[in-house]
């Protein structure tokens, strides 16, 4: 809201998980965070979100949302990883300094306490790798990655365990603000698929 966006929330226990046809139709960007209750999300809602992403809605998947039905469906893989929760330090390195998502950041920033995610992360090779994380226990992780599916842009961003104040961190907030602007594609041109009539006369040959 501080960046001038019209923001609303949708939760699991709402009818249709708050993701009604109208909400999805009006959304330029959807941020998805989930934990433990991934299987409780109705497949019909997942399919509607999937269709909207293919049609151009941006999607930002946060932290344990890597196991969400929608992320798995879009990735086509298991999206599994290593994890450990002991409150260790995470250092996020910017590995694509020209990317709009990292605008205003230094070459790295740190979170004093976070859950560890470690490789191998079972996702397709990212189209753009934006962040790599190093953890105090020695692991590394591809913690900021972008994809395109249909007309939609997707950004996966690793930090955000619920027991730590990660989303109060100024750098994390900056990344999310930048990512919202990057994944949004309002006004993208419509394309026609299937059989089409020619737009110019075609002369008979032979």
Where are these regions (language model features)?
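Short acidic/histidine-rich motifs immediately flanking catalytic phosphotransfer sites
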Residues: 23-30
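Extracellular ligand-binding/catalytic regions of CAZymes and related secreted enzymes
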Residues: 2-3, 141, 149-206
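Redox-cofactor binding/interface segments in oxidoreductases and associated redox assembly factors
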Residues: 31-32, 61
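A glycine-rich, often tryptophan-bearing local segment used as a flexible ligand/cofactor-contacting loop or short
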Residues: 37-105
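Catalytic beta-strand/loop cores that center a nucleophilic Ser/Cys/Thr
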Residues: 1, 6, 83-158
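Solvent-exposed loop/turn segments at secondary-structure junctions
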Residues: 14-17, 35-39, 65-69, 108, ...
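A short beta-strand-loop structural module common to alpha/beta enzyme folds
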Residues: 3-16
